[in-house]
From Swiss-Prot:
Pfam families assigned to the protein according to its UniProt record, in alphabetical order: PNP_UDP_1
Species of provenance: Salmonella typhimurium (strain LT2 / SGSC1412 / ATCC 700720)
This protein's pathway: Amino-acid biosynthesis; L-methionine biosynthesis via salvage pathway; S-methyl-5-thio-alpha-D-ribose 1-phosphate from S-methyl-5'-thioadenosine (hydrolase route): step 1/2
Protein name from the UniProt record: 5'-methylthioadenosine/S-adenosylhomocysteine nucleosidase
Role of this protein: Catalyzes the irreversible cleavage of the glycosidic bond in both 5'-methylthioadenosine (MTA) and S-adenosylhomocysteine (SAH/AdoHcy) to adenine and the corresponding thioribose, 5'-methylthioribose and S-ribosylhomocysteine, respectively. Also cleaves 5'-deoxyadenosine, a toxic by-product of radical S-adenosylmethionine (SAM) enzymes, into 5-deoxyribose and adenine. Thus, is required for in vivo function of the radical SAM enzymes biotin synthase and lipoic acid synthase, that are inhibited by 5'-deoxyadenosine accumulation.
Enzyme class, UniProt record, top EC level: hydrolase
EC identifiers of the protein: 3.2.2.9
Record-linked Gene3D superfamilies: Nucleoside phosphorylase domain (3.40.50.1580)
GO cellular component, as recorded: cytosol
GO BP of this protein: L-methionine salvage from methylthioadenosine; L-methionine salvage from S-adenosylmethionine; purine deoxyribonucleoside catabolic process
Amino acid sequence: MKIGIIGAMEEEVTLLRDKIDNRQTITLGGCEIYTGQLNGTEVALLKSGIGKVAAALGATLLLEHCKPDVIINTGSAGGLASTLKVGDIVVSDEARYHDADVTAFGYEYGQLPGCPAGFKADDKLIAAAESCIRELNLNAVRGLIVSGDAFINGSVGLAKIRHNFPDAVAVEMEATAIAHVCHNFNVPFVVVRAISDVADQQSHLSFDEFLAVAAKQSTLMVETLVQKLAHG
């Protein structure tokens, strides 16, 4: 099995990258892909860049060039669920765009023409992630993750997301674009991210302060999940 892992930022991939043995670096389309073995398992780790276009471009290049069997999207996210705090884990059961609006033509809010309203994560990957969470004794929430090209840092943006997606547990800027590409390529995916901030008026301060905490937690989760997927 070859496992594809995608993170947007240097801070979100550096801990994993440093653990890859026999590492080789591929630079394509402004993205960097690091291939090798993570605890004996073949992996391809992508640093995509921030935002939906960068994530979609990177995911496509990763899938075409490295042919992974599954995709794990890792990194940080803003918490929406009331039980979440910095360092907690969110696992996707579905991903949707929070900034797409073609409702004038009868589509659901967040749905693009020719696409499902939401992109469902793979049940087996979800189950494996939740098993890792239990083993590591982490606080976690599974649910809807929403994505858009905006850092949510104020009451107006937060209220809009809560109104349109009352069940959303986290918000970030890449996951749904990655899920969209995986859907088109028929490759299973799951989003496993750690909370770096709570999406409110102080979220930019929290993000800067706690990104390292989120990166450490998400790296622990992904490393454990890769082991479980490879060896059961």
